[in-house]
UniProtKB/Swiss-Prot annotation:
Organism for this UniProt entry: Rhodococcus jostii (strain RHA1)
Example of a GO cellular component annotation carried by this entry: cytoplasm
Subcellular location: Cytoplasm
HAMAP family: Arg_deiminase
Catalytic activity, EC: 3.5.3.6
Protein's UniProt name: Arginine deiminase
Record: active site: 395
Catalytic activity: L-arginine + H2O = L-citrulline + NH4(+)
Amino acid sequence: MNASGSAPLGANSEVGQLRAVLLHRPGDELKRLTPRNNDQLLFDGLPWVDRAQEEHDAFADLLRSRGVEVLLLSDLLTETLGASGAARIQGIGAAVDARKLGHTLAQELAAHLRGVPAPDLSTILTAGMTFDELPVAANTASLVRRMHHGGDFVIDPLPNLLFTRDSSFWIGPRVAITSLALPARVRETSLTDIIYAHHPRFRGARRAYESHTAPVEGGDVLLLAPGVVAVGVGERTTPAGAEALARSVFEDELAHTVLVVPIAQARASMHLDTVCTMVDHDAVVMYPIIQDTLSAFTIHREDKGVSIRGADPFLTAAAEAMGIGKLRVIDTGLDNVTAEREQWDDGNNTLALAPGVVVAYERNVETNARLEASGIEVLRIAGSELGSGRGGPRCMSCPVARDPL
């Protein structure tokens, strides 16, 4: 513990004892989802918000019962906006887009938001704002204001904030602010950036990677072992993003090896952690259909740059980089139909609380049973509503403090 009684910030693995985690309790942003916009906002359906909140509360309570400090993004954002004028300016600047609103309305809206109390501003930055909710009168000189319908968004909501894994991740003692690939999510990183830059809890936290234009999302990044990072490249993270991340962590001496893992560019496998997560220091649970075909390019830090080898079988390359004889794969033993169903329902997306202890959705009965048969303790949570955005326990959590391995 540090002087404040909090666990030291940082993580060097996926499975070290989890001490503190960043979550986002679903809020009014989910109530903005409609049949007209849910695809654009990356949700497969319209979640029952009250039930989603109940499920998320149970998830957070489970973590607390295991000694994990739960930090809620909305609370941190409200505290930050209330304490820092610079944070307010940064948040408003990211949310008010003159290219969309025009100069007149953008100026009027920004001026209004500068006087909004921190709790209300926090809600607007996460849940968005419609033209009906504008304080600016319809007879303004803004053509945009006159021509838009009342329910259209002036500031888009951020329903995918639920998945805190993607907009930042910790590697060693540093935090990486990512670059999200799709328009519906781009502004999320402005909020995590505000919190890490201005909240007292993170004072002095150094950055590992930030502000690159090439997309890198946290769901594609696995800390396989101290000094060894796997980065999925597929629907979200690009090869250029993976290369930029590798060079950044090498320059900061946060890793000696980066494995770049091509994955299918499909909704079902949008991130590496939708098909593979670590459940012990030498074990993964993996979508069985890809087990024999997943490959990796190995990037090593060298004295005068980097070297790239491969592609080689992922399991072989990972074990070699980790310095172990073999990476154990939990044999889910599922037929193709059941495997596909449970992968779609985030059966492979587990959150490790410690070596051999994971949180998983209860609905993936077969995968959970096989994990337990292999000696893994599975802590089950409900996710019938949380899963409608295609994310499981790992997606919904950003570890900010783990014990080192």
